[in-house]
Design a protein with these regions (language model features):
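A short secondary-structure junction signal
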Residues: 129-135
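Glycine- and acidic-residue-rich phosphate-binding/metal-coordinating active-site segment common to enzymes
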Residues: 139-143
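Active-site nucleotide-donor binding segment shared across nucleotidyl transfer reactions
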Residues: 19-52, 56, 61-62, 220, ...
Length: 278
């Protein structure tokens, strides 16, 4: 088994437990981003992708965070900024503590972590177009400040627009850590996101994903969801996956150039056994 195969197997073990808990408690989840793309284009993982992204409507997300710590197996746990102030992200991860990995895009001691899958809250947005743009600006402003508190973890290899490059250059020269903390910014983001209910919103989604506002889509794309084959199981995804993937990725069936096929994690140890370098 390759390192990637091992990581995929661990990720599948985690996602099966998450789905089991959701099904037992009537909680709704959806595949998001590259996981939804992988299901449609590859019937499972994108071959070079090494994580799974699920989203839950805010109410179900909060219930999951309450229930999961008692129901996950002993070697799995949830972590987010509420349970650990040093946790780098706003979202929740479900970890397999028996599997140690290195998160290669992080440049500090936080890069040593456990195999995991990501759980995102799905929130609404203002229905008024102008108010929605203001809302996006406010959330992304606090997200940028949060990221700049972790300057050694900014993904500098990622493809960015000229405007984004200029903004990053300017903001990197501001002593952000003297003005705020990442925890404060996460709390502000949380307050903004919680203020917008899914019910009644024309556009919903996950602005904290890699594609930011491109992951905010018409609510009917989600609908009640639909099941898609994913490796050896079926997972719930968008009711209209084609519309969602086109909105987010454009020509999603076109494979990206090889230099843009990024991995995030590498297994170092599993069940106490060191994994040999490939």
């Amino acid at each position: 088994m390759t390192n990637m195969d091992l990581l995929h197997k661990v990720d599948m073990d985690i996602v099966k437990e998450v789905v089991r808990i959701c099904d037992a408690h009537g909680l709704k989840y959806f595949m998001l981003g590259g996981t939804m793309l992988g299901a449609v284009r590859h019937g499972g993982f994108i071959p070079w992708d090494d994580d799974i992204d699920l989203g839950m409507p805010r109410e179900d997300y909060e219930k999951f965070l309450e229930i999961a710590p008692q129901e996950l197996p002993s070697h799995m746990k949830t972590v987010n900024y509420r349970t650990d102030r040093k946790f780098q992200y706003y979202i929740t991860r479900v970890l397999d503590t028996d599997t140690k990995v290195i998160e290669e895009r992080i440049g500090n001691e936080n890069k040593y972590t456990n195999a995991s899958i990501d759980i995102f809250p799905i929130d609404g947005t203002p229905n008024n177009k102008f108010k929605r743009k203001i809302y996006f600006f406010r959330v992304l402003y606090h997200r940028a400040l949060m990221s700049l508190c972790y300057k050694d973890s900014i993904d500098r290899k990622r493809k960015r627009s000229f405007k984004e490059k200029v903004l990053l250059w300017v903001m990197e020269r501001i002593p952000v850590n003297k003005l705020t903390t990442p925890y404060k910014q996460k709390c502000k983001i949380d307050k903004l996101l919680r203020s917008q209910k899914v019910e009644g919103s024309l556009y919903i989604g996950n602005i904290m994903g890699a594609y930011r506002t491109r992951e905010i889509v018409p609510a009917e794309f989600y609908g009640e969801g639909k099941f898609y084959p994913f490796e050896d199981i079926e997972l719930r995804g968008m009711a209209d996956a084609d519309a969602y993937l086109t909105f987010t990725y454009g020509d999603y069936m076109q494979l990206p150039p090889e230099d843009q096929r990024k991995t995030h994690f590498k297994i170092l140890e599993i069940h106490g056994q060191t994994v040999a370098e490939e």
